[in-house]
């Protein structure tokens, strides 16, 4: 795969050390969703995969996969949640879009849903739509793709945080693939840090 400049920039501040190629069947994904996906998202799945950023945000799988301990979060469920939130907020009177144009790709620990607004026929031009839980606006469009949005969020480049949590504290940024996190849990370690955790694995089958 050709290296994606946005993902390369993101990797400079958030190493892919604990990421993994998700090995996505993109024709199958496109058949299910009825659309292609942005090049930066495709590249992210190939370099990082789905997983957690600092335990504060999760990047979702485009299609379901069985987990080692629990099923990892997927786009379909959170897309439904975002569309339901749109309806609950007043539908078109609150945010005048077709709800079918809302597709989720991530969530935060503050219960925000990170989405694309897919009204442009070119997926690489889809802006990020934040469906916020405790943000100034319930729906806010940001004129960046997924990778640039994450870069700006992780670099603290927003004057006002676009999400409901203090995402960046100036510390180390870490991405952990969902499969690695679940292995750590099974081994009695903290899924995010890998440090011993007496509670990790407590509810393992």
What is each residue range found by the language model?
Residues 1-110, 162-168, 176-205:
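A surface-exposed partner-binding patch
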Residues 18-19, 121-124:
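Helix-boundary capping/turn motifs
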Residues 102-103, 114-115, 128:
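A broad, low-specificity signal marking well-ordered, structured residues that form hydrophobic/aromatic
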Residues 112-120:
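Short, surface-exposed beta-strand/loop micro-motifs that present aromatic residues
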Residues 123-134:
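Intrinsically disordered, low-complexity regulatory segments enriched in Ser/Thr/Pro
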Residues 132-159:
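Compact, glycine/acidic-enriched structural inserts
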């Amino acid at each position: 795969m050709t290296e994606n400049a946005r993902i390369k920039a993101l990797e400079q501040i958030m190493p892919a050390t604990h990421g993994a190629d998700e090995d996505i069947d993109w024709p199958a994904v496109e058949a299910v969703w009825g659309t292609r996906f942005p090049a930066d998202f495709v590249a992210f799945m190939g370099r990082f995969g789905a997983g957690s950023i600092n335990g504060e945000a999760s990047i979702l799988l485009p299609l379901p996969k069985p987990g080692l301990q629990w099923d990892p979060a997927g786009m379909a469920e959170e897309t439904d949640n975002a569309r339901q939130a749109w309806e609950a907020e007043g539908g078109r009177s609150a945010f005048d879009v077709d709800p079918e144009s809302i597709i989720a790709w991530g969530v935060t620990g503050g219960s925000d849903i990170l989405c694309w607004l897919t009204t442009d026929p070119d997926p690489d031009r889809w802006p990020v739509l934040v469906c916020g839980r405790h943000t100034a606006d319930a729906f806010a469009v940001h004129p960046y793709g997924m990778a640039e949005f994450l870069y700006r969020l992780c670099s603290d480049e927003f004057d006002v945080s676009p999400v409901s949590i203090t995402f960046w504290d100036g510390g180390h940024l870490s991405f952990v693939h969902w499969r690695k996190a679940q292995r750590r849990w099974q081994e009695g370690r903290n899924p995010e840090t890998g440090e011993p955790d007496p509670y990790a694995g407590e509810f393992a089958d």
